[in-house]
């Protein structure tokens, strides 16, 4: 096993093809981290000209100190049962990390617990310190240890039937409401950033500005690894649908009235009352859409998301939504359409991102888990974070300070949420 010098293209091709590959190990992802103070290096190892493992190393300077942290996000990408490859990856990483004055090397492989026995054993033998099996969204981790994933290598109907029953009803309703899911372009990021700002204000979290999302899009879209989706409500088509709906309801009402006049049966009267209630709701919706048409004849955007790719894996990233017309369930329409798009573009899985495992109802993470669990998902529990310490005194000092910083961040977050 030896060091290999490979191109960015060869690195990315290996990551996309490997079962332990991940979006965060793509070279273009490293470009998106520059705005937040990270820079990157790469290592690769192999034998007989064949790549056996790679690592994209992110470095960030420790404030007021001449040291850095080396972070291999969702790496290394290798077969963790291959001791020789793993050991060589560590050796090459140590050389680079020491040159960059890193006090530690942190990794968090995309390896699930039920497949991670070899990884745990071999990483421990190499001197890595395991950070434990804590909750998926523990503040002690950089990346979530648990995510929710929907298998999408199946037909539209099979994907739909994998959703929980109540969620299927919501998706059906969202499809009938008349919203339009658009695969947008760079210009659409302005609408997306505005939706994200609204979402942050509503849910109490700090949001990124437009330049951050432009950076992600510019870095990854050209290779087909980033797409922007927006959901638009256009009033004119919805008004046309409501008019057709009212015609059908009025016809049904007339038939029921005639039937009730001939024979006054309570069941017929109940049906008549139901139809009249539906007519009233449709009239109210028509008034609402007429008002929207006057104010926004071209429609308004209700939600959006970035859909990312790494080979056969797709990722739902940075979802945002408006406070208006939430009863139209735009996110449900968007999720189903993005899953189908991802499958059509080679993805076998659709990752909803981080979660805890069945949190209590009073947990701040319960709503997130409850939303993600109804989409035919399974819990992907990773083996977690590992640290390889290069500077023991500094590592211990930073580990002691980190809990205080975490508490401060939680306090700020709760203030934003008004708790």
UniProtKB/Swiss-Prot annotation:
UniProt feature coiled coil, ranges: none
PROSITE patterns: FEMABX (PS51191)
Top-level lineage group: Bacteria
GO MF term list: aminoacyltransferase activity
Any one of the GO BP annotations: regulation of cell shape
Catalyzed reaction equations: beta-D-GlcNAc-(1->4)-Mur2Ac(oyl-L-Ala-D-isoglutaminyl-L-Lys-D-Ala-D-Ala)-di-trans,octa-cis-undecaprenyl diphosphate + glycyl-tRNA(Gly) = beta-D-GlcNAc-(1->4)-Mur2Ac(oyl-L-Ala-D-isoglutaminyl-L-Lys-(N(6)-Gly)-D-Ala-D-Ala)-di-trans,octa-cis-undecaprenyl diphosphate + tRNA(Gly) + H(+)
Chief site of localization: cytoplasm
InterPro entries in alphabetical order: Acyl_CoA_acyltransferase, FEMABX, PG_Glycine_Bridge_Synth
Enzyme class: transferase
EC number(s) given by UniProt: 2.3.2.16
Cellular component terms per the entry's GO annotation: cytoplasm
Cellular localisation: Cytoplasm
Keywords, sorted A to Z: Acyltransferase, Cell shape, Cell wall biogenesis/degradation, Cytoplasm, Peptidoglycan synthesis, Transferase
UniProt cross-references to PANTHER family, sorted A to Z: LIPID II:GLYCINE GLYCYLTRANSFERASE
Function: Catalyzes the incorporation of amino acid(s) into the interchain peptide bridge of peptidoglycan, using aminoacyl-tRNA as amino acid donor.
Family: Belongs to the FemABX family.
Name under which the protein is recorded: Lipid II:glycine glycyltransferase
Gene: femX
